[in-house]
Amino acid sequence: MANVRTHKGITPQFGERTWVDDSAVVIGDVQMGEDCSVWPMTVIRGDMHKIRIGDRCSIQDGSVLHITHASDYNPGGWPLILGDDVTVGHKALLHGCTIGSRVLVGMGCTVMDGAVVEDEVIIGAGTLVPPGKRLESGYLYVGSPCKQARALSDKEKTFFKYTAA
């Protein structure tokens, strides 16, 4: 596949039943779990650090997933890690961050370097999660920069596996 590219001798790896649209590009040190989907015009670029994506994740149209390279400012760099049952909404940007399991990243969100999103979180559309910020499990976050808005309902918590499937 021309849209799956080896970089520095490392070729992306995909679990069973994972689908990548022909217009999406996956480059380098990327490992995706089973039953994932990567939708049109998405870029997943593991060029200077690793990207790990769990099972049953949906990476929607136009999203950009990238790492943070090592530098004097950040000697180790930051990988990009996604847990299981994660939905990344249309045109989201995830950069060198860690996303737990059962998370909805809303459309147009930006999650920056070193941020950590715990399990069972909803990040509202257009939200900015600044560098190094930690989002506590069980809450909705909104705004730029993000703020904790309210606790998630039990119904919302059951919705994660549906949206990612």
Give, region by region, the residue ranges found by the protein language model.
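Glycine-rich hexapeptide-repeat left-handed beta-helix
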Residues: 1-14, 41, 47-84, 90-165
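Thr-Gly-centered strand-to-loop micro-motif
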Residues: 21, 46-47
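Extended, small-residue-rich solenoid/repeat segments and analogous flexible loops
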Residues: 1-35
